[in-house]
């Protein structure tokens, strides 16, 4: 009996020691891993995104791939319809011909000449719809869309940035067809200099090497960049971005079309002449015009509330509302230019 009790006691102590060791190791891993909290948050976000996008959650991802997968665009931001983009008919037609059609032909044709370009550059002044166009392309082509935040590729631990750069392409490959979108690409892949930090230079080199590798394969992966400073982009990157599209400041006709898109769900008086407003808004971009419309509606709402009315009882917008908003916005822009010159 004594021997039996001793054996039971030993067994209990062994089990207790094993349990304590397991919990200790678990907590040590938790507190010693510098990326533990980031990885846990990434797992939760990826699970939610995959549910929204209908992606198979059984696909295995490494911890670096999970961090990249958090940058899939899902929900309401998954893409834009072509009719949400005003004033870009010629550009939209060219994007359809050079990108959308080749993506559809890729699985049907054996010719590499019918494959889509592996690198696309959208360049032009700020606020002209480059990001919106990129999302519209992804939606029309049925592609997954990774809105790559370059800050997420940087890590203070040696070698981690290169692993994250590799994860960008491995994630894109697992969920292809995929568009990897890099906004302000000039800030990430700008001209390399001898004084660049070693880790940054290595990450750029890794990114370009992987890009070349996928370009020579049959994978449907497209890197799309947007910039308002194309001359600052590294020449080696420009060589890889064979399809380049200028997104210019809209002219008067295009501004009128953009205003129609922005105001299509708003109450406007029949006497409003959007053509005249577009003429008065010379030099304004699409995002500028959206702000002008917001100012016009805000002024109307303020006047309605001041007179004792409700925001839900707004009268249709008048020509004068838009004229005042354009004048106010243009005046602020002019003052900003003067301060910059001073």
Swiss-Prot record:
Residues 1-6 are mitochondrial intermembrane. Its main location: mitochondrion. The keyword Transmembrane helix applies. ATP binds at residues 124-131. PROSITE patterns: AAA. InterPro entries: AAA+_ATPase (IPR003593), AAA_lid_3 (IPR041569), ATPase_AAA_core (IPR003959), ATPase_AAA_CS (IPR003960), Mito_OM_Translocase_MSP1 (IPR051701), P-loop_NTPase (IPR027417). GO terms for biological process: extraction of mislocalized protein from mitochondrial outer membrane. Residues 26-342 are cytoplasmic. Keywords: ATP-binding, Membrane, Mitochondrion, Mitochondrion outer membrane, Nucleotide-binding, Transmembrane, Transmembrane helix. It comes from the Eukaryota. Belongs to the AAA ATPase family. This is Mitochondrial sorting homolog. It comes from Caenorhabditis elegans.
């Amino acid at each position: 009996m004594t021997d039996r009790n001793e054996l039971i006691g030993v067994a209990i102590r062994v089990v207790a020691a094993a349990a304590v060791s397991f919990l200790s190791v678990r907590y040590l891993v938790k507190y010693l891993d510098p990326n533990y909290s980031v990885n846990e948050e990434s797992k939760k976000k990826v699970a939610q995104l995959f549910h929204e996008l209908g992606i198979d959650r059984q696909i295995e991802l490494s911890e670096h791939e999970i961090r990249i997968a958090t940058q899939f665009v899902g929900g309401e931001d998954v893409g834009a319809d072509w009719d949400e983009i005003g004033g870009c008919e010629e550009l939209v037609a060219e994007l359809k011909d050079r990108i959308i059609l080749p993506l559809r032909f890729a699985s049907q044709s054996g010719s590499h000449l019918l494959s889509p370009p592996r690198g696309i550059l959208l360049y032009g002044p700020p606020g002209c719809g480059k990001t919106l166009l990129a999302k519209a392309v992804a939606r029309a082509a049925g592609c997954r869309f990774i809105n790559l935040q370059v800050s997420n590729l940087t890590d203070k631990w040696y070698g981690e940035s290169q692993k994250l750069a590799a994860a960008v392409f491995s994630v894109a490959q697992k969920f292809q067809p995929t568009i990897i979108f890099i906004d302000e690409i000039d800030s990430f892949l700008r001209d390399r200099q001898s004084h660049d930090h070693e880790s940054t230079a290595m990450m750029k080199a890794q990114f370009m090497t992987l890009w070349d590798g996928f370009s020579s394969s049959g994978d449907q992966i497209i890197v799309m960049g947007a910039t308002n400073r194309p001359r600052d982009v590294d020449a080696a990157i420009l060589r890889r971005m064979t399809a380049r599209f200028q997104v210019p400041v809209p002219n008067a006709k295009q501004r009128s079309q953009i205003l129609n898109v922005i105001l299509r769900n708003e109450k406007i008086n029949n006497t409003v002449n959007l053509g005249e407003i577009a003429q008065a808004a010379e030099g304004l971009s699409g995002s500028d015009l959206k702000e002008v419309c917001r100012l016009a509606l805000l002024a109307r709402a303020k006047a309605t509330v001041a007179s004792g009315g409700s925001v839900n009882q707004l009268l249709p917008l008048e020509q004068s509302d838009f004229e005042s908003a354009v004048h106010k916005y243009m005046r602020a822009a002019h003052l900003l230019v003067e301060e910059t010159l001073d």
